[in-house]
């Protein structure tokens, strides 16, 4: 049976493809390439949030100008283009959980939630309703046949690798999705956009979380969860109270800059004690992480969970999109996934994604991932943390801070 360039049966003109058009250069080129090949292309753009101050902000995605840019590209290509209002859904599925997670001292990854819900669930359902044979996006990741299904692999352009944000994609979704840019370098994508005469050819890439102006997470939390912005104290892991802070939402594990205390020692945020509004700080070595426990794991590997190797599986894992992967061993016992690092890793916070790969090399397969619930460090560090967390004197300092604030 003849398969076209998207591994669909028949000639391109027999396949209808919905393209998720964000208004950026990548998704525009996807629409252009597929249209050029002869596919029946339909463009869809999602309005995700109240544009506000972000409407004309350089480096934001999903802003108001993006919708207009997507419309103009679709017009250039002569394809149908629809704008769907997903603002309410986006707030419920992405923004509110992000704020809730941050208020609880976690470091969430909202782009994963957006792909997991709005883009690859809701939009995919819309594509099916339109009779599309596949949904194509401008993500830099590869999709290939693997046995009876398809699997995800790191892209050719490793500098643009977006696999970290796509680990939660289900097998059913992977089988329906297509990623035409997986084998292309970004520079070539821009060249194609120029050749096709797109107004977005020189447009800046999106960099910030779309609903977080200037990357200030605390501003969003303060607006959506004002009750979570409580003052407290900054405590050294040795138990010494170093100063005060105006809210834990201003901190994340591993942070060094902007802590708000000066001691002559390089200090990092080691732990966030949300219940007692304490920011625990210490030297960098206190951040070294040995083990992680995960929740909401999406397993895409070939091994059946009911027959998972008792000694685990060796693989590469990433805990931040911008960091290299590290060798680790994944375990699954009694419904719980855990990761033992075989190479040093640090600054891992609850809420972060931990993504699995079958190796460190280019083109490695994505085996799934999950979200960090908690981590384990060296025994000595864990003992110091427990000691300071149970210290009644620093708790008293927090209580005194609350009373002082209330009396003003």
Swiss-Prot record:
* Coiled-coil blocks: none
Q: What is the lineage of its organism?
A: Bacteria, Pseudomonadati, Pseudomonadota, Alphaproteobacteria, Hyphomicrobiales
Name the predominant localization.
Answer: cytoplasm
Q: Which UniProt keywords apply?
A: ATP-binding, Cytoplasm, Disulfide bond, Nucleotide-binding, RNA-binding, Transferase, tRNA processing, tRNA-binding
Subcellular location, record wording: Cytoplasm
The family database entries (CDD domains) matched by this protein are listed as: MnmA_TRMU-like
Name this polypeptide is given = tRNA-specific 2-thiouridylase MnmA
Any one Gene Ontology MF annotation carried by this entry is:
tRNA binding
Q: Which organism is it from?
A: Bartonella quintana (strain Toulouse) (Rochalimaea quintana)
Tell me which residues are marked as the site Interaction with tRNA. Answer: 139, 352
The Swiss-Prot or TrEMBL record describes its family as follows: Belongs to the MnmA/TRMU family.
Disulfides per UniProt: 114-210
EC numbers: 2.8.1.13
Q: Which domain of life is it from?
A: Bacteria
Please list the residues that make up the active site.
Answer: 114, 210
According to its UniProt entry, the function of this protein is described as: Catalyzes the 2-thiolation of uridine at the wobble position (U34) of tRNA, leading to the formation of s(2)U34.
Region described as Interaction with tRNA: 160-162
